[in-house]
Amino acid sequence: MPHTVATPPPLLQVRGISKQFSGVVVLKSIDFTLQPGQVHALLGGNGAGKSTLMKIIAGILPPDTGVIEMNGQPCFNLTPAKAHQLGIYLVPQEPMLFANLSVQENILFRLPKHQADKKKMAQLLKNLGCHLDLSVSAGSLEVADQQLVEIMRGLMRDSRILILDEPTASLTPAETHRLFSQIRMLLQQGVGVVFISHKLPEIRQLADWVSVMRDGGIALSGATADFSTEDMIQAMTPEAQKGALTDSQKLWLELPGNRRAQSRAQSQQPVIHVHDLSGEGFAHISFHVQAGEILGLAGVVGAGRTELAETLYGLRPASTGNVILEEVNITAMKTANRLAAGLVYLPEDRQASGLYLDAPLSWNVCALAHDRQGLWTQPAQEAAVLERYRRALNIKFSHLEQPVRTLSGGNQQKLLIAKCLEANPLLLIIDEPTRGVDVSARSDIYQLIRSIAEQQVAIIFISSDLEEVVQMADRVLVMHQGEINGALSGAAMNVDTIMHMAFGEHRSVSEPQGGTASSAENKGASC
């Protein structure tokens, strides 16, 4: 008889996993397999069940039914500690570092002595091209650097199964390239990677196998090469997405007591004029934004975009220069006064600085009004406000008192936008609005931002996704090392030009530009 070679079992096999919360089914008998040396991409809309499934595999949540096997052996009563011992590590979408500990302490936290090798850590950092100061507190890092620290924690643990939840959402193209190189090195060692992403080109570049989740089940699964991009999108969003908000949504979205309608609707004066502003992380910034205009702010991580936004909002002090909002100098104003004047900021990290995760949805959506009016709340009014934004933004939730942390990432982002809109902005600063958001929710957010601009709100749009910047902005300012390297509009706005300018090149474009923000504006580049 011919000798038959036994096929080795999968690295990870999940069979019949189901889960429900408060009677709501979120996972429906899921089967999922990961082979050694394989990247298995996981796609799905916000709320499809991706994060819940991964939390079950990582031991954070128990399944209601089903079996998890690793190398053919069943894993019962998984906990995070037991999962780590088995070589399963989840790198979360939102970094969960200890803010007061150093970068090095975070990377080595609770590592067994035989794994806490500083030479190995230094080599991994070199492989990733990281130049982090290991002695600084993790809380002082930008989100992209915090994400790299989370990835380092997984790599240091010699993980056999590495679950990456939107790992490139805040990374530059160069950082993404280095991360992918490191992943390929791990694959050669037999490590299996679950790669959760909404960036379809990255999935095609990296993943051997893809599964698409929808409504708590697997809607599509197979070799990545067997499916077109349209196949994947249709599996995620079976109902065709409309190209714009419906008339009904626009009606619900109309800003209450729109400041622009109340004041100089026909004024040609800019909503905001920034003149020679300097502060921590940036210098000599000058630009202005008109009512109804979307001004893109592009640049690599560390260029000073978030620092500039936080200074405009009053979270950081300016060292020199002036900020004029509607002809009023707000440079010395506190944040609360700027908010009352109509300057509203949607921060990059929605969980750390944007939303109160354990507070009810209805309270969160009116939180900026609470800041202005005190802590006395009006539950009926809050419920009506939340219902209005639910209809306008298609926010999905079960009940008004539901804690924010129970929402999917895309619905959290929509709630944060609703919170900012309820403050009735003249100027809305939006920092990375689609980070970690799926294809359909991203489209919703784009249409939402355009509809806000149509109501004559001025918008500063900050994003690391250059295609997104080109798609959304009327003009783009490109920052490099804390200064504006140039301004682009019209046909001159393209990803290639922005990328080169973000890395410090002065390119020949149709719009005049200068080496500093002041010179760019004086030449008409930002007028």
UniProtKB/Swiss-Prot annotation:
InterPro entries: AAA+_ATPase, ABC_carbohydrate_import_ATPase, ABC_transporter-like_ATP-bd, ABC_transporter-like_CS, P-loop_NTPase. Belongs to the ABC transporter superfamily. AI-2 autoinducer porter (TC 3.A.1.2.8) family. It comes from Yersinia pseudotuberculosis serotype O:3 (strain YPIII). Its EC number is 7.6.2.13. Part of the ABC transporter complex LsrABCD involved in autoinducer 2 (AI-2) import. Responsible for energy coupling to the transport system. This is Autoinducer 2 import ATP-binding protein LsrA. It is a peripheral membrane protein. The gene is lsrA. Keywords: ATP-binding, Cell inner membrane, Cell membrane, Membrane, Nucleotide-binding, Repeat, Translocase, Transport. Transmembrane segments: none annotated. GO terms for molecular function: ATP binding; ATP hydrolysis activity.
